[in-house]
């Protein structure tokens, strides 16, 4: 249930400030202005932190996902990106590097292609170093958080938790990943049933 790991999603870049109350009012998630600077900020390394969903199959996927990173690279054409995903699904590390993202600037939409499957996403405006992912499936909603590093600040976490409450989730419904479950570097020993993978070095 993270960017590029679920079939239908809406990407939200960063966190939109909200305040948690007994009856929270959600701060509006505003689509990003898809200028060159915004598109360029999508490039690089991201770490999936946590997520929650009302859609049972997505909840099952999140429970299997122990840790994940993804890196977005320039593609062959303008407004086309290549994506490499490295994730631990239960005890197995998996690398996927065949998906692409197409950017449609006129409506802040991203289309993610993986094989024969495609999903549309709307990029939302906020902090350049964070992703909130808002996704929809059969009238179900979900949110997930990614960041440039495995750690987020207390303030950033509180803002995301407020958004969870705004969308009807209890905090205990959020499923959190842990850096201790990161896939090992090449050559390290792994447990039975696991596959060691190395993350690409960032230049």
Describe the predicted segments one by one.
Residues 1-203:
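Calycin-type beta-barrel ligand-binding domains and close structural analogs
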